[in-house]
């Protein structure tokens, strides 16, 4: 029986160093590819128990071409489609028309106090570094959350790194679309949202009116109590990023690893043959 406790030969050591260098070189394109990422968007209802709920949140990563509404202006059809009923079909369609390369989606279902939901979107951070959102607040006739400045949230910097890990919305930032007359009997979540009466006003901040729904039974079965102050945190949007390697880089890395493995096996076989011959 032949045994050996000799240290690795110099060629083996050279091979190990070469393999490491190759891995670094082949892996560099993967690490450097920061433009395309998978973004997990998580939404959380921070409102007190028995308080406000939220319709599914409409979201989009974009380049700045879509502006759904403005403070002090008459609500547009896209934002009304969110504020009155929460469906947001016109919002999504207008977003797609204004910014065709944007990445859009809808997060969660009805979000009750304390609940959360998430969605994963693949985002080109160089093309779509900005984030826009809109979602109905219930109970209400036409209240919603969202950003009126499309450039307000630049969540990715020039290198593709995440620059805003989360967005927190306070009660004082809840919007009134001014498109539907206040009427508990026609309010979503506590009444018949189909009984709408146009108001013809303008978009404004308004959370205080939510207290007028106190004591009413919600669609979820609890007795509503707003319990909000202007500084109360009511909603959070969080972002978590996972890099997406380029397909070409993955192919190169796989081929390189296979090649290095084959070379290592040949070197070991040659070394074994030499040792046997010498013995």
PLM feature segments, named:
Residues 17-27:
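Bacterial N-terminal signal peptides
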Residues 36-38, 46-162:
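Structured domain cores in non-transmembrane regions
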Residues 164-241:
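Extracellular low-complexity, O-glycosylation-prone Ser/Thr/Pro/Gly-rich "stalks"
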Residues 1-13, 275-279:
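N-terminal secretory signal peptides that target proteins for export/translocation
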Residues 246-265:
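A short, hydrophobic C-terminal helix/tail in secreted or cell-surface proteins
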Residues 36-62, 217, 221, 227-242:
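A long-range scaffold signal marking pre-active-site subdomains of enzyme folds
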Residues 262-279:
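C-terminal membrane-anchoring or membrane-association module
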Residues 28-35:
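Sec/Tat signal peptide C-region and signal peptidase I cleavage site
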